[in-house]
Amino acid sequence: NNNSWNLKFSNATVNALLMLPMKASTSSPSESNMDFYSGVLLAVKDLSKEGISTDLSVYDVSGTNIPVTSDRLSASDFSIGPVNSDAVSKTLAIAPEGTYVISPLDHRTAGLAQSHSNMIQAPTSQGTQYRDLVKWLKSETHSGDKVLVISEKSAAKNASVTLMNEVISNASLSCARYSYNILEGRNAANAIAALMTKTGTNRVIINSESEAFVNDAVRNLDMLVYRKYDVVLYSPSKIRSFETIDIENLHNLKTRVSTSYFIDYESPEVRHFLMEYRALYNTEPTQFSFQGYDLAYFFIKMKSTYGKKWMENVARMGNTAMMQTDFLFRELGNGGYVNEGVRRIVYGPDYSIRIVKK
C-alpha cells in the first residue's frame, strides 16, 4: 500500500511559505492579516508537539509584487497566499508544478484553479454554498409543503441573485415566486400568505443581497409565523452579516444557512484554541486567526502524513471538519483543487445556533 509507505518515510520537515499583505512597516498594519499570521504560528507550535517540524518563511506582500523567486518556490512544498487575485496569478506564473499555491481568503480567485494544476482554492465558492442550500431544502420538503422564492422587484442586476436563480432552476425546484419592493411592504405579508399552505410547511428562500429588503421580508415572514403558518427560511450566509436583522426572527423562522465559515464555541477544540491563543497573544482570536490556524494545521499535517503525492490523497478524502471551516477538496479535470466543504447551521426555536450533520 503506497500510503503506508508514505506514512513511514514522509515525516521530513514541511517547507512552507506564507505570503500576506501585512503592511507591517507602515503606520497602519493590516490587523486581519496579522491575526491570520498569529493563527498560523499557533498551528505550527501545536504540530511541533505532534512531532511534525515546519520550516516556515513569512513574506509581507504589498500590492502585486511577488517577493520570492521561482527557485525559492521550488524549494517549498506550498505557499499559503498571496491573497488577491493578481498576486495569486503572478505567483502561479513562476511556481513550479510541484509547489502548490493556496488561495486562503478570496473566493474570487477560484477561476485560477481551472487552468493551474498546482492551485488550491481554500474558500468554498458561493455557487457550492447555494447548491448545498437548495439540496438541503429539497431533502426536507415533504408532500403538502410549499416552496416559495421571494425577491426584490426591479432590483439592480446582481451576480449573486442571478447565480441563485440558476441554481434553483438547475435543481428543478418547483416553487412559487413572489417579488415586491419595500414601498409595497404593508401588503406583502398578505400576498405571501396567499401563496402559502396552512397544513404543510412553507419553505422559503429570500433571493436578495439588499439588507433593507431581506430585513423587510424576514419581518413579514415572522408576522406569518404569529398567524400560525409553519415557515422555515433557507438563507445564503450573507444574512449572518446583516446588522439590522432581528436575530429572534431568524430563530422563529427556524432558519437554515449553508456557509463556509462557522465557529462552534461549545466544541472542545475551539475552547482549547481560545485558551492557548489568549495565553500566547493576550487578546481574543478573530475569524482570521481561526482561518490561519485551520489552513496551516490541515496542509502541514497532510504534507507530513502523505509525503510526495500528498494532494492526490487529500483529494480522495472525505470531509474534514476544522474549527471554523470544513475541508473537502476535489480535483478539477486538468486544473487544480477546490474546496467543496460547506457547514450547515440551524437557528433553533430554543435560541441555539448549531451545526447539523449532513
Give residue ranges: language-model regions.
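Extracytosolic ligand-binding ectodomains
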Residues: 1-358
